[in-house]
Amino acid sequence: MNISRKEQRVLHVLAQGGRIRHWRDARRIVAVDCIDRDGNRLVDCDLATFDRLRRRGLIASYGGAPYVASEAGRRAVRAQPDNR
């Protein structure tokens, strides 16, 4: 699967324990914020990147919780030296 650099960065953060918080306006998601496990904000995560990852099934939200990497997302992310 072809994944852009922005998508790889977001998936890498999520694979290490990060979360994507989302805000809704009635029914639609209008804003997202990607937070790594240390509490730092990832600037590369915008609404378009979020939509692409969600459409491909690489991220998922369980029970209204923040979005995390799904099993498919963890398999799709490329290995990097600092992965845990």
Per-region residue spans from a language model:
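A short, conserved structural fragment
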Residues: 54-64
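Minor-groove-contacting beta-hairpin "wing" of winged helix-turn-helix DNA-binding domains
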Residues: 65-70
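Short amphipathic alpha-helical interface segments
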Residues: 2-47
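A general structural signal for well-ordered secondary-structure junctions
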Residues: 19-20, 59, 83
